Amino acid sequence: MVLRYTVIDPTKNITLLVTTPVQRSLQAQTAAWLLRREKEAEQVGFLEESDSAPARLQMMGGEFCGNATMSLGAWLCRKQHLPMGESRDFRLDISGADELVPCSVTAVRGGYIGTVSLPLPLSVEQRSFPTDRGEVTLPVVTFPGICHIVAPTGTVQPYEVEALLRRWSAALPFDAVGLILLDEQRMRIDPLVYVKPTDTAVWERGCGSGSAAAACALTHRRGAAQCLSIKQPGGTIAVTTQWNGSAVTGLTITGTVSLGREKTVDVVF
């Protein structure tokens, strides 16, 4: 199977956008193969046709991904030869989202700046999880198709994070689960995301939905809207939340995107 894909860099969350049509039944296997080939890549999305949007993005685990949404918007802008300094607004069809996702992209020197209006969290709740030292209670932020466990600094040790995430994700009915290590004082996250269909656990250098989850958890705890610049290994993602006194009513992320060249490869399973 000959595939074309583009390597895209949204805040170092290296994303492979496969532009050759791939059957859903083969996407997880194809994504796993590509991730073994592209050592810097952290996730794979598949371009599909949509009746209601310029394009549809199907992520490898069926999850919603803010950075990948931003990446698709930037890819469309390059395809349309958007001049530097100009902007385009899209409503994109993204896996894990029940409605079209608004995405605004501006062409800048060296790439693009994208803002995505994320689906609102379905829930933000405290849940208890087992560790070798007893149970810990942590906020779990659930979005369509993905949930994130937000762990403040010191709650879990770095050496046990991947094992704990795999263990905890078995109790969560999602194909994609993140464990977001949050240093609130430095306003920094270190995100680990486990995707069950591909059995991959990746320390992401930038995570849009993980940044949003941390911001939503803080919004609930602080009881106020937040405007945060959240550092992560690959850079900074800005997150803005709106709050009505009991729930998050608005959620956007903003980050940078750079696009690499298109590649062609013969996939052999």
Predicted regions and their residues:
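A glycine-rich beta-to-alpha transition motif near the start of alpha/beta enzyme domains, typified by
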Residues: M1-Y112, T142, C147-F269
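Membrane helix-loop-helix hairpins that form the core translocation module of multi-pass transporters
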Residues: Y112-L120
